[in-house]
Amino acid sequence: MDILFVLSAVPHTSPWSTQVAMVMITCNLLAIVAGRYAIKVRGLGPSIPVSGVEGFGLPELLATTSLGHVIGAASILGLSNVGLIS
């Protein structure tokens, strides 16, 4: 397979910038807030050493930030294709 063909199929993405970082941080925070209230069975794994988050442990944090990164990557690709972030 020709490498130029593969490279032509990859969409143009914006380089890392403050705008890209803010989109990713916002998506992760929204996923954490949504997961805090949406996860029914909580507190089964190890806890995180942050006060005020009883019942929200390491498994919940990893799950919500994983979802936040998926949403953030899709948002960054979409916003850069539309031209709202550069």
Curated annotation (Swiss-Prot):
Source superkingdom: Eukaryota
Q: What is the membrane topology noted in the UniProt record heading this document?
A: Multi-pass membrane protein
Record has Transmembrane helix as a keyword: yes
Its Gene Ontology biological processes? photosynthesis
Name the major location: plastid
Q: Which InterPro entries match?
A: PSI_centre_PsaK_sf, PSI_PsaG/PsaK, PSI_PsaK, PSI_PsaK_bact
Q: Which UniProt keywords apply?
A: Chloroplast, Membrane, Photosynthesis, Photosystem I, Plastid, Thylakoid, Transmembrane, Transmembrane helix
Spell out the subcellular localization from the entry: Plastid, Chloroplast thylakoid membrane
List where the protein spans the membrane. 20-39, 61-79
Does the UniProt entry include the keyword Chloroplast? yes
This entry carries the following GO cellular component terms, namely: chloroplast thylakoid membrane; photosystem I
Q: State the family it belongs to.
A: Belongs to the PsaG/PsaK family.
Q: What is this protein called?
A: Photosystem I reaction center subunit PsaK
* Gene name in the database record: psaK
